[in-house]
Amino acid sequence: MSVAKKNIKKYFLEQALTQVKVDEYLAYKFHSVGYSKVELQKTPMGTRVIIYAERSGAIIGRRGQTIKQITKVLEEWFGIPNPQVTVVKVEEPELDARVMAFRLANALQRGFHFRRAAYTTLRRIMGAGAIGAQVKVSGKLRGERARFEKYIAGKVYKSGNQVVRLTDRAIAHVLLKVGVEGVEVIISKKSEEERPDDEVRIKSPEEVNEIVQKIREEMQQTQPEAPTLEETVEQSGGETQ
């Protein structure tokens, strides 16, 4: 392997590692305001940092003070040149697995019973239009021995291409008096562009009539017209009786 290829490989590994570190830092700092993810984009003017969160105003801060602090940390701690921070609001937080995982972890930290908090999270996800959802809580739930409880609603994909296309998964941890508890949220969702392969939808009568009419028009365009009696006689060279 040439030196140039090694340098390219090292460069992309360093970029990926930097993004993971920045993501962990922002998740630790803003988990209570619905932090979702971060994107780093290289530009000729520097690095564009896009932060996705449920409560974007809490990350911006009063008069932009919080964003200024984030910019300083990104530049000094993580070595990101000229970071330009942009905060984007998550439009459907109930369909974002990481936002819901942090919500569930915060509810456990505030003292809510794990089963009640899990079912509340599940209902909100399904109420937002998800295909299915799974919520898993693990730790010392009701005794000295660690265990887990899992709650499922709808259809949750666990294998195949639909896991990549339609499934969102996130994990969060919370420190309680009894120890550390973990939560896992899996959401199967669909959009106008991405739909499940096994989805069956019955067309409405209006859609069926529209399809039938279209087929009839295509058949009329492709089907040749029947020849008249005179044309038939001329082609055969005979006479009508």
From Swiss-Prot:
SMART domains: KH. GO terms for cellular component: cytosolic small ribosomal subunit. The keyword RNA-binding applies. It comes from the Archaea. Residues 218-241 are annotated as: Disordered. Transmembrane segments: none annotated. Pfam families: KH_2 (PF07650), Ribosomal_S3_C (PF00189). Residues 22-91 form the KH type-2 domain. InterPro entries: KH_dom (IPR004087), KH_dom-like_a/b (IPR015946), KH_dom_type_2 (IPR004044), KH_sf_prok-type (IPR009019), Ribosomal_S3_C_sf (IPR036419), Ribosomal_uS3_arc (IPR027488), Ribosomal_uS3_C (IPR001351), Ribosomal_uS3_euk/arc (IPR005703). GO terms for biological process: translation. Keywords: Ribonucleoprotein, Ribosomal protein, RNA-binding, rRNA-binding. PROSITE patterns: KH_TYPE_2 (PS50823). GO terms for molecular function: rRNA binding; structural constituent of ribosome. Belongs to the universal ribosomal protein uS3 family. Binds the lower part of the 30S subunit head. Part of the 30S ribosomal subunit. This is Small ribosomal subunit protein uS3. It comes from Ignicoccus hospitalis (strain KIN4/I / DSM 18386 / JCM 14125). The gene is rps3.
